[in-house]
Amino acid sequence: MDISYEAFFRSLTGVAQATKAASNEIDTIKQLLSPGNEGSETKTKSASLSFQDWQVIIQQNVTKMTETTIHIALVAVAMSFLRETARQNQPATADDISQCWTIIRDALTSTTSSQTHFTASRSAQGFLSVPLCSLVKDGSIDELIRLHVWMPDGKRGNPDFHLHSHQPFAQSWILAGQGVDHSYEVDPVEDPAEATHAGYALAWNDGKGANTAYKTHQASSTVQNTGKLFRAVKIHTEAHARGSTYTVPAAEFHVSEVAPDALHATIFFFDSHRGFVKDAGVLGPKDGDSFTQLRDPAGVTPAELAEAVYQARLREELD
């Protein structure tokens, strides 16, 4: 899978947004790795490099980069690989995913790159997430790649709001543990007796105010009962373990289930280029009003999440 310069620089912008990287750090990477300046033979703007060659070129420039910029650049390469592989419907091998995971883990656990601000937050679905690459367009997710980790801590979110959908198409690559995905057919109804749920509208708050514009770094999210009634029927259940991948179409309602005492980790890619539905929402109790999920991870750091996933993968390899 070749990665173009355009694809790499697009990912670099997304990683900068996800990590709140300083503009001078991103400028340094762009200058060093632009076509013709990357330490190898002159390239044209249309040139592409393999996943491996991108890593080699970054390593050739390590003396001109800080550890922070090295990690940012490598994560951008990994994000580019995942995006291009997914969009071209190409399978990513176990070795490919392991390489991407190693790059991510090294970045999250680096002790000297203090200026790279990876952050963890608690999802309404119970898992902890770390944004790795985020591109928002007109207030909606354009591309978003995150690390999702369900810790063996019993925290699985508010079960009243587990049935949800995503605005963008989504793809997940399983890193460790097992999860079960339940798909639902959801139809609007008028009769309250037929309804199983009510529809809820979602708003995000970044500490400056709440609205329907998506925010990469959130303080909380709130769902509000719309008064619209729906009937949800489970139509498919599928278990996913390490080495597998699955997709969730835009606006398809589903529930992700992970045992409360188990660890489960995925790389999750929200991709509006493969589908986007603006009014995708959440379902909840018919007689409910609203619910707010605080994003506070209660002190859990991205480094701790990465280490927990690393240890889980080691145990799986020994089993």
Spans of features found by a protein language model:
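Intrinsically disordered, low-structural-confidence terminal and linker regions
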Residues: 1-31
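Extended, charged low-complexity segments
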Residues: 5-10, 282-319
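A short, N-terminal "cap"/entry segment at the start of jelly-roll beta-barrel domains
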Residues: 38, 43, 47, 51-146
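Conserved short histidine dyad/triad with adjacent acidic residue
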Residues: 113, 146-164
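Short, conserved beta-strand element in jelly-roll/cupin
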Residues: 165-181, 185, 269
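A short hydrophobic beta-strand segment most commonly corresponding to one strand
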Residues: 171, 261-278
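Short beta-strand His + acidic residue motifs that chelate non-heme Fe in jelly-roll/DSBH
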Residues: 181-182, 248, 254-260
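Short acidic-glycine-tyrosine-enriched beta hairpin
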Residues: 185-250
